[in-house]
A protein has these predicted regions:
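Residue-level marker of motif borders
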Residues: 48, 161-162, 240
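Phosphate/anion-contacting hairpin/loop surfaces
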Residues: 64-179, 183-184, 188-197, 244, ...
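Preference for short coil/turn "hinge" residues that link or interrupt alpha-helices
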Residues: 34, 149, 158, 207-210
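Gly/Gly-Pro- and Ser/Thr-rich, intrinsically disordered tail segments characteristic of DNA damage-repair
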Residues: 1-114, 190-193, 198-201, 235-236, ...
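Hydrophobic/aromatic-lined pockets within catalytic cores
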Residues: 15, 19, 161, 174, ...
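C-terminal accessory segment of soluble enzyme catalytic cores
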Residues: 202-259
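Residue-level signal for secondary-structure boundary elements
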Residues: 19-22, 152, 164, 207-211
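Short secondary-structure boundary micro-motifs
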Residues: 30-32, 38-42, 78-81, 117, ...
Length: 259
């Protein structure tokens, strides 16, 4: 958490506030307010884009261009505040200051956000909400890989194949698919290929319902979450700890299929 829909919401929030604005400085607040000195420190613009759970910000001017990848962890989020008030934001990690005295601030507490200049060296598949054909092909062409021998509830968190799918997205997909989550992933995909479409559609629905405001993450636009909470399958039914010690929620009718 945040998952694909939340990262997309944050990316759009950043675009809304930073588009066409000139920024003066960039700070690594997490490291005692250290100001970045290279390659961009003054007079730059910002462009935001998301792919699955990954958020990439591009900082550029006529002379320089730098990309920074942000992984939001369990609690990462952004806010847009007057520069003279940024220190009121708890657990700040990173900020940029605009020439009109506003600041974009990254914050997050427990298991919070990470970022890296130049990008993380990770294997992440295509985002199903943006590149669905590539997303589908990446799954279908690799069904003999070891990951697809795992139970479907485990395999769905693999970002190399199921980009953007996290804890609540997987439980919601499997609830509405109405199949035992304890079957091998390959078997489920062959039997019910619509699960591939649902990896896209469930994320799009969540995005339209303002994202998963479930615990530590809140929509930066202060949007209502009532409809989302009625729709999502999370903290409902039975649960177990998966191999990564994350809580998976499932329909109680599948309990007898659990090994």
């Amino acid at each position: 958490m945040p998952e694909g829909p939340e990262v997309r919401i944050m990316s759009n929030f950043i675009k809304k506030n930073t588009e066409h604005k000139l920024f003066k400085k960039m700070f690594d607040v997490h490291k005692e307010n250290t100001e970045y000195e290279n390659p961009i420190i003054t007079d730059f613009y910002v462009y935001s884009q998301s792919s699955g759970k990954l958020l990439t910000l591009s900082f550029f001017n006529d002379d320089n261009h730098i990309d920074i990848d942000f992984f939001m962890g369990m609690s990462g989020n952004w806010c847009w505040v007057p520069t003279d008030e940024w220190s009121n934001v708890k657990f700040t990690r990173f900020r940029i200051d605009s020439e009109d005295d506003m600041s974009l601030v990254l914050y997050g507490g427990y298991l919070g956000p990470k970022y890296k200049i130049g990008g993380f060296d990770t294997k992440r598949g295509p985002d199903p909400t943006k590149e669905f054909d590539k997303f589908k092909l990446n799954i279908v062409d690799n069904l003999d890989k070891k990951v697809f021998q795992l139970p479907i509830y485990e395999a769905l968190l693999n970002q190399e194949y199921f980009s953007g799918v996290g804890n609540y997205i997987r439980s919601t997909i499997l609830y509405y698919l109405d199949e035992s989550p304890f079957q091998k992933a390959k078997d489920v995909i062959i039997k019910r290929p619509e699960i591939i479409d649902m990896c896209r559609d469930i994320q799009i629905t969540s995005y339209k319902l303002n994202g998963g405001q479930l615990k530590d993450w809140k929509n930066p636009n202060d949007s209502n979450s009532d409809d989302f909470l009625k729709w999502v399958f999370y903290q409902k039914g039975n649960h177990l700890k998966d191999s990564d010690n994350r809580t998976f929620w499932y329909d109680p009718k599948w309990e007898s299929f659990r090994k």
